[in-house]
Amino acid sequence: MNNRVQFYKIIDNISSFNRLSHAYLIEVDNYDDDYQCILDFVKLILCGRNDKNSKCLNCGNCNICSQIDSGNYVDLKIIEPDGNLIRKKQMTSLQEEFNNKSLLDNKRIYIIEECEKMNQSSANTILKFLEEPEDDVVAILIADNRYHVIDTIISRCQIISKRKFCL
């Protein structure tokens, strides 16, 4: 089974059994190739048309999916490395933003791309956020190799691997 199909099967199971975790570490082969899969996972969590009888994976018809596709969904924050690092100030800013309630009365999601680029200071800052999650917040951390992420972060996340091979 190819990795994309396997990934969609995993996220479909998460939805079907209503087992949404507060934090995911998604291990990818290629950020660019796998990014749409990550956005589809976000849509599955947030889509206004998603219910137990109807799955939404990239429906493209509702406001939420359209806003996610255009990068304008207010309760989705994407953190990218600043140069070669994810810095403490980025994590502090994220925490401040997510201390407020959702503007849309829905889940709030943050994605940390290349989370293996967190230094010890930024990892410690986000760790407390992962240890004491708000009910309406979901973290999605993306790494090309989970073994490059600090153990305390890994231990607080559900791991989903899209890699073509396991180490």
What are these regions (language model features)?
Residues 118, 133-153:
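Sensor-1/coupling segment of RecA-like P-loop NTPase cores
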Residues 151-164:
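A short helix-turn-beta junction within AAA+ P-loop NTPase domains corresponding to the substrate/partner-engaging
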Residues 1-114, 138-140, 151:
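P-loop/Walker A NTP-binding region and its immediately flanking N-terminal helices
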Residues 96, 128, 155:
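Conserved adenine-binding aromatic site and its adjacent loop/helix in ATP-hydrolyzing domains
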Residues 99, 124-141:
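Conserved catalytic/switch belt of AAA+ P-loop NTPases
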Residues 73, 91, 123, 146, ...:
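ATP/adenylate-binding site constellation spanning eukaryotic-like Ser/Thr protein kinases
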Residues 113-119, 124-127, 131, 146-147:
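Catalytic acidic motif of RecA-like/P-loop NTPases
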Residues 114, 141-146, 163-166:
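A short beta-strand-to-loop transition that corresponds to the Sensor-1 phosphate-sensing loop
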